[in-house]
């Protein structure tokens, strides 16, 4: 039985996918957030998507990601924490979060993922960034029958 809580997270431009290893479930919701007067969060995920283009002028429904990149750190943080709370009520002690990220990210973009993950209830979490091609290969089961070898090449640690 799995004791620790492990989550795989894909913050896509249009959808957020969260895999819970303990429950073996995938939560898939729209990556949208509804905000009143630019400060109060009203709805997140599919609830915000249902409000899209049907809201009064003081309520904005936005996508906090743009072209696979974080456009608004505070809004992505609100989306992530709300959807993780919907996924599981109790995160446990030091949950592990694996984020699927683009390969060509800058250090500033990488830092924004760390900023998002270490807020609120997740401040004691272990967080890892996994390149999208590697995450896709793992999801397809390509690496299941490969023995692990570690190569250190020019100061770069490569796991194969």
Locate the predicted segments by residue.
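Nucleotide/phosphate-binding catalytic cleft detector across ATP-hydrolyzing
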Residues: 1-29, 34-42, 46-154, 158
């Amino acid at each position: 039985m799995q004791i620790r809580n492990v989550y795989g997270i894909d913050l896509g431009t249009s959808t957020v996918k969260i895999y819970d290893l303990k429950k073996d479930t995938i939560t898939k919701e729209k990556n949208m957030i509804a905000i009143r007067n630019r400060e109060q969060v009203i709805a997140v995920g599919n609830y915000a998507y249902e409000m899209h283009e049907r809201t009064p002028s003081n309520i904005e429904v936005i996508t906090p990601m743009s072209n696979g990149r974080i456009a608004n750190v505070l809004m992505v943080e609100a989306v992530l924490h709300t959807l993780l709370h919907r996924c599981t009520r109790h995160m446990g002690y030091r949950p592990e979060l694996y984020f699927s990220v683009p390969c060509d990210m800058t250090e500033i973009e990488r830092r924004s993922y760390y900023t998002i993950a270490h807020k609120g209830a997740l401040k004691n979490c272990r967080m890892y960034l996994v390149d999208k091609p590697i995450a896709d290969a793992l999801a397809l089961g390509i690496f299941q029958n490969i023995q692990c070898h570690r190569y250190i090449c020019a100061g770069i640690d490569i796991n194969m």
